[in-house]
Structures are given as C-alpha cells and as structure tokens.
Amino acid sequence: MANSAQTDTVSAGNLFSYDSVALSDPSTHIRLLDLHPASCYTDDLYCCIYTAPISPPPSYIALSYVWGDSTRTHEISVANEVNDGRAFIPLRLTSSLDTCLRHLRELHYRRQLEPLPLWIDQICINQDDNEEKSFQVRLMRDIYSSAHQVVVWLGPAVDDSNRVMDALAEVGQEFLDKIGDHTEEEHWLSVDRLIKEKIEQPDAVTFLREAYKVIYMLNREHSFTRWVERTWFKRLWTIQEFCLCADTIFACGYKVVSQKMVSALTDFMRCIIMDKCLRGLLETPDTPTYSTLFSGLMRLFPLFQHRGYCQYPYRKETLEHLLVELFVGVTPPCVTNKRDKVYGLLGLAGDADELGIRPDYTTSTTLAQVFTQTARAIIQKNWKIQRKRGLQILRYGSLGQRKSAPKNETDLPSWVPEWNGRIAKTYQREMSFLACGEIRMPDLVPTTSPTILGLRGFCVGTIVDLGEQARVDIWRRSADGAKKIVGFFDNFRRLLNLSKQNKRAKDIYASTAHHDAALWRVPIGDQHIIFGVGRQIAKRTDSKEDSAFQNFIAYYEDYVRRDDDWKDYMAAYQAGEEQAKLKMGKHMDRVFSEGYYMGLRHMEGKRPYLTENGYLGMGPGLLQPGDKVVVFHGDDIPYVVRPVPGKGDNTYLLMGEAYCDGIMDGELADTAEREDFYLV
C-alpha cells in the first residue's frame, strides 16, 4: 500500500501526465479508468485510464463521494504502454478516495474478476487545467445520467452504520414488496397513497407498525442521525450526482443498499409525522413520540424530492427554484469553489440550456460575474415567457440580505443574491398580492453594463420616519422578549398616529376603521399564517385577526406588568417544576393557536416605515429616511431603494423587499407616474 511517505519520494517528472491520455475534444469525450483486481485490501491500487465518447457511452459506474482533505497523500499506479510492454506510473490521490477504491475493489471482486470501469472526477478530469475542467463540468449531467450505475460512497463503517444499512436494506425491501413501489411514475413518492390502499390489510398494518418501531429505535439511539450527518449529505455537488442516474446505490463500509429502499422509508417517516391518524394506528408503547424522526427526515426528504423532480422530465425544477430551496432560510450545502453554487446545480435545472449559463473556471471570470450573469439570465428568461412574479429573485438580492456588511467581498451589484446561506426567506407566502396590477410582465430597460439592472415601474413615496425592528424574542424565556414586542407596537402606534394626521393619507384608506386596523395588519404583512401539509401557507387577514392581535398584545403587556412574577416563574421552569412546564406549554399553545405570532415571525428583522404621503409599511432593517418605496412592473410586492449620490436621479441601491399598506392589490398601478429605475 502506498503511504504518504512513499508518495513524497516520487519526483514530479515520474508522475502520471494527463497528456498521455489527452481528450480529443473535452466537450464530447471523457476519461474512464478500469480498476484492477487484488487479493486483499492492503494491496496497491492499479488501473488503466482511457478515453471514450460521452455519446454513445460505454458501460461504467460513476462515483459520488467527498474529497475530504484535498492533499493528495496516496497514489494509484496507472498502466502505461512502453515498448510493447507495460509500466506503471503513479497518480496521486486523496486519502478519502484511496479508502473508497479499496472498499469498492473488494466489493466488486467478491462477485467477479473483471476490471471495474469507473468515472471519478478526481482522476478522470485534469484538476489543474481550468479550461478542461470548464468543459467537463458542462458534461456532468450526461456523465451521471449515462452511467450504468452511480455508487454513493458514504465512508467506512463506523458509528453503528452496519446496523443502519442492514435495517434500511431489510425493511426497505419488505416495504417495496408489501406496500408497493413508490418510485413508479403513477405513484411518484406517494407512499401515503400506497399506505391508504393497503391499510385495511392486517398484515400490512403489522408490518408498518414493526417498520415504524425499527426506524424509531434507530433515530432514538442516534444511529440514523449519525448516518445522515456524514459529510456526503452536506455537499452541493452530491445532490446532482445522486439524482441523475436511474440505478443509484449507497455504499457504506462493505454494506450496500438501493436508494429506492432508503427513499421508501424516508417518505414513510414523513407520513408518520404529517398524518395524525396514521400515527394513532401505528403507535405502540415502544414508539411513544414521533418527534425523534425529524432529524433524519429533514436531511433526507429534500434530497429525494430533488431526485423525483429530476427523474421525471415534466417535473424538472428551475435553477431559480433550486437556488432558493438550497440557500434561503436553511443551512446551505457546502462547496469548495463558490461558483459551484451555480454550476453544481445546472445538471438538475430543467431550464439550464435556456439560461445559457456555461461553467467557467478560468481566472478571467470572477465570482461576481458568475452570480450577476445567473441573476440576469433568470430575470430575462422570466421576462421572455411573461411569467408572473418574474422578478422574484430580487427578494434574495438586495443590501438588506447582506447580513455582514453592505459591501461584500465579491463586490456584487445590490440586486444580485450572494447565495451565502444567510439569506432570509421572503415574507410573502402563497397568496394573491398584486402590487403591479395587471402589468404582469417585467419591463426591462436597456443599460450600458451587465452589472446595472434597468426596470420600469412607479414610486409610492419617500420614507420620512421609522419604527423599531420586529424582534419576536419570546424564545429567550425572559421578560426582555415581552418588553421588545410591546415596545415595537407602542412605537408603531406613533407612526400610525402620524399617518392619520397626514391629509394625503385619507386617499389611502376607505374608512377610519380600516386605517386603525393598520396597527395589527401592517406588522404581519397582511398575512395570516396557517400550517398546511408539510409547509406553511398564508391567506389574507380578515376582521378575526383583530381579535387575535388583541389577545396577543394583552398577553405580552401582562408579562411586562408582572416582571418579577415572570422571573420567579422562569426560575421554577428551569428548576424543572411540572406546573411551570405545563404553564409554558399552555403559553406556547395560546401563542401559536391564533396565528398572529407566526405572522409576526415572518416579518422578523423588518422595520416599520412611514412615507411623506402617509403610507405605512414594513421594510428591511437597515432603512433610513430618504429611501423610496417602489413597485416594478411584473412584480407583486414593492421594494425599497436608496438613491446613489452623484449617479443621477434614477440610480439606486436595492435595499430589499417591502410591504406597503394600501397598494398591495394594485391600487396605484393604473394612476402612478411611470419611472425608470437603474439598480447598481
């Protein structure tokens, strides 16, 4: 076995050169390697490397794995034809790939002695040639979709992983046999439908109850949690690699399980969590609580959703949707090269060809250019197809989303998202705002630079006064949270009174009562949040929300008045007194049941504002007087922009999305004066 000390003695001149296996055309050809057999794990690694067209492809297995430490401390010997004989030249590998190849070699040669044909990015792409890498990454979708099989290598067997793999294989196969194949197109991840079809059969209920028990125990003992917390599940490139091939398997140590079995049990966990009736049928004294399933489900279910979209062409996700799903309001997947936040998703995006984005790793292209090109391509594509909400990507750009500083290290324009994992979700849920009125199509204005986005729209007003940021802070379990909530609404009442004193505001509100209702309507963006099946959805508020608000604010005002009582209560809670715990549970039930808290939580970090003409609303936390509230053609919510001194009257920084009371249904769309806005 070649160790790091041996590798260090090999001179650069004696190492494998990619020139010896040059690609005739890196846009149409790939390299493959045949891994040679060996008698035991510690035998040196040998292979031969050759080229092949990607179409039609030969038979090969594509590997999905994690590089780990990129230092190449190990080696594989590559066959080299010399004078009609054969010599072997070393090619350096990372430690993780060395371990992987030794396991795969042993797994393969337990069944047959033929060489194992593989595609592995670390070996088959010249990683030192950025131009070749750019062409080969463009082929990534074809490489993985054309493979005979994709092997997901999770790593050696540790942390009780053999038990997890055995359970997934055994219970997963039995699930497919007794309940049905949820991956068939007519079912497509519809385990709940398959269960409902079989639930009247006693043997099916018996099996499901036992399957629930097995999954429950793996989660309770954290074996499954440790399995899904392996590094492979946290990387971005692995999502694409996992989704593209029909035959995909997980390998962990010397255990192998089909993705289909893991998928079935993953969706079964979702059904248990979401379906109270099913839980009631399957629960036993051995499975007292379903909450233990959450950690495993949250890591796996999105992965299989992406795979489901990918396997059926008419369900393909757009690049915009993928970026939002993976980088907004969640812990984002990891990448080594930041431009792979885009390039690593192109193989999954159904609109990748239409967008015209081509991977480019050359030093002449900057990260800012990659992100700017991506945002502009998405906006222009949506404009072409007259898609409603075609400017939605602007919600994730803006200086309001830059949590570290207004200027970032990539020097992005203000309207381009960083996709850095600190992006907050848009406050808008699934509902019918339409601030742009009937002008559903983005109206792009030509500009002199790709970094400037020109949009046509109208100005609502200029901000003249501000309230405090919304901080829903009850989770700190101190009276400070209640004080902040009460203080926020006291300050907003001040803005409301100023609006009512503004004569121009009389044109905004149909009645005094409607104006008064802005007190509870504006802070939650006129949205009542409810829980749907597996997600949160929203509807427009109505008069019932007034009652919910009165209960909400009265509760927190009571906390503020009883500060000392609250401190005593929290001391009792922390000491574990049952009555205190019960009281906290009832408190949470009350807060959540009426929905006002959830609406306010979706506006977390936003700041109330008042315009010179009496409009009230919520905008990014870094607002300042002089900022403008605007609506762009083709978008259904307003934004806040900031004039750029010395750049002309129409040049602005995009500060972020906003809510503006009295315009969200297009009240100004027909009468407001049109302007051109240039975002830089």
Swiss-Prot record:
InterPro entries membership: HET, HetReg/Transcr_Mod
Domain of life: Eukaryota
Annotated function: Involved in the non-self-recognition during asexual growth of N.crassa. This process involves restriction of heterokaryon formation via genetic differences at 11 het loci, including mating type.
Protein name (database record): Heterokaryon incompatibility protein 6, OR allele
Organism this protein belongs to: Neurospora crassa (strain ATCC 24698 / 74-OR23-1A / CBS 708.71 / DSM 1257 / FGSC 987)
Gene from which this protein is expressed: het-6
